[in-house]
Design a protein with these regions (language model features):
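Short, tryptophan-glycine- and acidic/Ser/Thr-enriched carbohydrate-recognition patches
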Residues: 35-39
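Bacterial Sec-dependent N-terminal signal peptides
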Residues: 1-22
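Extracytoplasmic beta-rich repeat domains
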Residues: 23, 30-33, 45, 51-64, ...
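Glycine-rich phosphate/oxyanion-binding loops and their immediately adjacent helices
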Residues: 73, 87, 112, 196, ...
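Beta-propeller domains
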Residues: 75-77, 82-84
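Short loop/turn segments that connect beta-strands within beta-propeller blades
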Residues: 83-87, 122-125, 166-169, 206-210, ...
Length: 370
């Protein structure tokens, strides 16, 4: 009997530890290197503001978090590190506005600014490890690829290049040239980087050597990041098209567009099981069957949606440019609750330790919970 009790106690402890890791760490602004936007925890109901922290200007960056530290950039040029009580741990001045989200790699914060500089900072105290300079602004969050003893940071720039940087030293490994601005983040699967550009292509690049694997024509600007799932990429475009690309065959499997509006998809999609979800500037959030492209439901949020949604096994968390935070039922798109923050929200929130963390145009970083 005592042995059974010990085994059960250990199982509970393991579950608790796993759950704790899941709730306190959100190291990539979309949750993982495939940029799927999937949350394996529940989203709180009946939320209210628990605290807010005022920065010096608009917050367009999405939050990331690790070890109870929240990292977010502001257009005042600072990277802010807050604890879960909303108190400042440290801040770092990058010298120019930050619109990109950060990446937490190991115990370091990687983030770019509008001067085109990419910084590596120590998570604990914000001390600079290195600075890498591109030739134009960085709007996208970096991503990380590791193989053996090599770790590379991948980030696009408005200098038309995808930059590959040694994560430890900050030295450039290679550059891949596109034909226009790179606004979106890179999605990564195995040895492949997948990203869209303002040149109208979805690029597939081999990470170890930086060589082009393929360019798939989307035919218009791709401002948002793609997400990857089971050998397929899902991405929206500036003309209001939403595409599913077979990465093995290197061709478009299906494409959907709303001919009535034709407004851009700025947001990145989220995927869970057979559903893929994305918001549009026409105020709607769309849910498609990821295999067929069939429209399963759409929901009018009341204002344009630039921020990417987050998805759980049953719910969708989305924000809009009116300043609303909405929780939708994944099954049918029904609005379960909405909270009026009152200031436009540019980028996706994070859910950390049962709390929703999000930045807004009014310069505040908000924490909402039960």
């Amino acid at each position: 009997m005592n042995k059974q009790i010990i085994i059960i106690a250990l199982q509970i402890l393991v579950i608790y530890n796993i759950s704790g890791q899941q709730t306190t760490n959100w190291e990539n602004f979309r949750g993982n290197s495939q940029l799927t936007g999937y949350l394996n925890i529940d989203i709180p109901n009946n939320v209210d503001i628990k605290w807010m922290y005022k920065t010096g200007s608009e917050v367009k960056s999405s939050p990331v978090a690790k070890n109870n530290k929240i990292i977010i950039g502001s257009t005042d040029g600072y990277v802010y590190c807050l604890n879960m009580q909303g108190k400042l741990v440290w801040k770092f001045n990058t010298g120019n506005a930050i619109e990109a989200s950060a990446l937490i790699y190991d115990q370091n914060v990687i983030i770019g600014n509008l001067s085109g500089s990419l910084f590596s900072l120590k998570l604990d105290d914000g001390i600079k490890n290195w600075e890498y300079k591109t030739e134009n602004q960085i709007m996208a969050a970096p991503n990380c690829w590791t193989s053996g003893n090599k770790s590379y940071i991948l980030v696009g720039s408005y200098d038309y290049y995808l930059h590959c940087i040694d994560a430890r030293t900050g030295k450039g490994a290679w550059k891949y040239e596109s034909n226009n601005y790179l606004n979106a983040s890179v999605a990564i699967h195995e040895n492949r980087a997948v990203f869209g550009g303002c040149d109208g292509f979805l690029h597939l690049v081999n990470i170890p050597d930086g060589k082009a694997e393929a360019k798939i024509e989307i035919a218009t600007y791709v401002a948002g990041s793609a997400c990857l799932d089971n050998g397929f990429a899902y991405v929206g475009d500036y003309d209001g098209g939403f595409s599913c690309i077979n990465l093995g065959e290197k061709k478009i499997s299906w494409k959907w567009s709303d001919e009535k509006t034709g407004l851009p998809f700025i947001a990145s999609p989220s995927v869970y099981n057979n559903k893929v979800i994305i918001g549009n500037r026409n105020k709607h959030v769309y849910c498609f069957n990821k295999n067929s492209g069939e429209l399963l439901w759409k929901t009018n949020t009341g204002e344009r949606v630039d921020a990417s949604a987050l998805v759980t096994s049953t719910k969708v968390l989305v924000t809009n440019m009116r300043g609303d935070i909405l929780l939708l039922d994944l099954k049918d798109g029904k609005i379960l609750w909405s909270y009026e923050l009152g200031s436009p929200i540019f980028s996706n929130p994070a859910v950390i330790d049962g709390k929703i963390i999000v930045g807004a145009q009014d310069g505040n970083i908000y924490c909402l919970g039960n």
